[in-house]
Design a protein with these regions (language model features):
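Beta/alpha (TIM)-barrel catalytic core signal, keyed to glycine-rich beta->alpha loops juxtaposed to Asp/Glu
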Residues: 1-163
């Protein structure tokens, strides 16, 4: 695809460290981006660090969580937002961007789209960053089961590995 000029960059999604290593061992052209679920309850520090160390950029999907937005109601997130006079969503997005993670929050509402963009104006300090890091739960909002077929050859472990 790159050689045929059909694309300039290659990215992967939901690749674990093991999957990235396996891909890179045989790849002539390495991917430049790994899109993974990241939010305050699923921070994936080990995978993010590995991606950085190997030159992969990281994109966070579901950066605000999902399923009723429990992440946005977390007392730590709310407190950080209040401290900066911003919304909880803006606080979470600012936290991710401060970690040099690309964010792709989903919204179809114009006001929320504006608010999400305005998160670029929120500057968190070291204490805020530590507080946000403290609420890690290793809790996926998307387990990937939607991509599996009942009689298919793959399991959720095949998708995520040991990560």
């Amino acid at each position: 695809l790159v050689d045929g000029k059909l694309t300039r960059h290659i990215g992967v999604s939901n690749f674990s460290i093991e999957a990235i290593e396996k891909l890179n061992d045989g790849a002539r052209i390495r991917p430049e981006m790994n899109q993974i679920e990241i939010h305050p309850y699923m921070q994936q520090d080990r995978l993010v660090d590995y991606c950085r160390d190997t030159g992969l950029l990281v994109t966070a999907y579901s950066p605000l969580g999902s399923r009723g937005n429990r992440v946005l109601k977390d007392p730590v997130v709310v407190a950080v937002a209040q401290k900066h006079d911003c919304t909880p969503a803006q606080a979470v997005l600012a936290w991710l961007m401060a970690r040099d993670i690309v964010v792709i929050p989903k919204s179809v509402h114009e006001q929320r789209l504006r608010e999400n963009f305005e998160a670029t104006d929120v500057a968190l300090d070291e204490d805020d960053m530590r507080r946000m890091a403290s609420i890690e739960r290793h809790e996926r909002m998307s387990d990937g089961s939607f991509a599996l077929f009942e009689d298919g050859p793959y399991t959720v472990y095949d998708l995520w590995g040991a990560e």
